[in-house]
Amino acid sequence: MASASQGADDGSRRKPRLAASLQISPEPRPWRPLPPQAQGAWEPAPAMDHAEGGQPQVSVLRDSGPGAGAGVGELGAAQAWENLGEQMGRTPRVPVPPAGLSLPLKDPPASQAVSLLTEYAASLGIILLFREDQQPGPCFPFSVSAELDGVVCPAGTANSKTEAKQQAALSALCYIRSQLESPESPQTSSRPPPPPLSVDSILTHGQRCAALVSAGFDLLLDERSPYWACKGTVAGVILEREIPGARGHVKEIYKLVALGTGSSCCAGWLEFSGQQLHDCHGLVIARRALLRFLFRQLLLATQGGAKGKEQSVLAPQPGPGPPFTLKPRVFLHLYISNTPKGAARDIYLPPTSEGGLPHSPPMRLQAHVLGQLKPVCYVAPSLCDTHVGCLSASDKLARWAVLGLGGALLAHLVSPLYSTSLILADSCHDPPTLSRAIHTRPCLDSVLGPCLPPPYVRTALHLFSGPPVAPSEPTPDTCHGLSLNWSLGDPGIEVVDVATGRVKANAALGPPSRLCKASFLRAFHQVARAVGKPYLLALKTYEAAKAGPYQEARRQLSLLLDQQGLGAWPSKPLVGKFRN
């Protein structure tokens, strides 16, 4: 989806422009896109095959070999799925105003029209311009038009410039209201209708992200699917590109690149083949799906020719560091349906003046072990060494704010990737507590010098409350033990049985997930060959393939957490000793 905005400097991380006005609705309702048959819902809609559950029929991804999970696939499939990504990057035309904002049912007094329109445009981040017609009509000497993000509304005419501007503002407000109430123009109009206001100029940043996550899920699964209720825990990663437009404006193109659902972890014994998914919470799964997408982007940039280099979100960079980085004017956003478990959820903590808040018990690291969430200091070492244990989503968000989303394998190839914003659809969360859980653990005191090796640095997320997309009905028990994942380039949803950490199957033990460690190690070696880094191919085990600087930053982070009484980040080197 695209809208005009004021540009940001290349490579800068700025607050999403359209999110400035986002507010929590007093009575939040699940946001639903228009049905596919509605005008503009999908432009164009992909071919659908109802025999295949209504999933889009495009080039099928060919995974490389059985056994240790699916590979990242062939380059052609990734390029073909770019088309689907563009479809998911368009917003359904939804006749709803942003949460917390509304226009009066009747036209305001002319004297108030300009200020009302200015306030409305500023709250959404829309560029508002008033343009005077140099050739007014014969009846009135002044003609002024209001332009909203490049869309010119019907002109206002009067005997003075002030009155013409007021009439132009009234005309723009009336036009916006008509678009909200009826997005389709009457076909019996006596004159050609003006170009419609883009819904991208009306929806906020959070609503746009929610629209993509909801519509992407609906495209992959319909309401008849037994997995439909998994939408209640959906999380997604949205990629935003800024593209220069006309008159110095910048268009923002949003694209859904990863989805995940789930609300629990595998609670069984550890296994050491790398074929078991441990943490199946929606946010964690969406982030792992993002990694799969990034491996594909590396192949696209290295093996896709000139077109692949243009389409990839990664670009080569000179110097001694990783050979690739995120392109300028490209941003990542996280959308989650539920408040992250752990420190962000357990208790409301008012600020304290002594700086002791990060050390309080609720802010300690917490781990899921044997189906229970408890502080890591209370987990017996024997359990950590033998059973699956996963730190809470709150703790992982705090970690990603420092180390980035890329992980230890991609750190060889891509500079740290940080999310620009987090949209949380749970209206019951406490924003200050969420912010402290992510941005204050551990305390990084610059007075003592740099605590982390470069290029790692804490990067704050812009936090927003967003509209929920979950079904209104309670999630059935059948979905509590399942986790779904998808990334841009995958032919469809993968269903994982949380109890086994493997793909759901009729047999007792299904095949490995395409998001498991073994699959990522295979993808790492595939990309290492593509980028011409033979020394990386010599790193045979998963543990050996982890980048040294990333591991050092992780060690420093764990040390600081432990020194500040928050608990040490658990380490399980034996789990990574496998080789493909």
UniProtKB/Swiss-Prot annotation:
Domain DRBM: 112-178
Pfam family, one: dsrm
Composition-biased stretches (Pro residues): 27-36
Alphabetized PROSITE patterns for the sequence: A_DEAMIN_EDITASE, DS_RBD
A to I editase domain mapped to chain residues: 258-579
This protein's GO CC annotations: cytoplasm; nucleolus; nucleus
Keyword annotations: Cytoplasm, Differentiation, Nucleus, RNA-binding, Spermatogenesis
Any Gene Ontology biological process: RNA processing
GO MF, one example: double-stranded RNA adenosine deaminase activity
Subcellular location, principal: nucleus
Role of this protein: Required for male fertility and normal male germ cell differentiation.
Protein name, entry field: Adenosine deaminase domain-containing protein 2
UniProt organism field: Macaca fascicularis (Crab-eating macaque)
Lineage: Eukaryota, Metazoa, Chordata, Craniata, Vertebrata
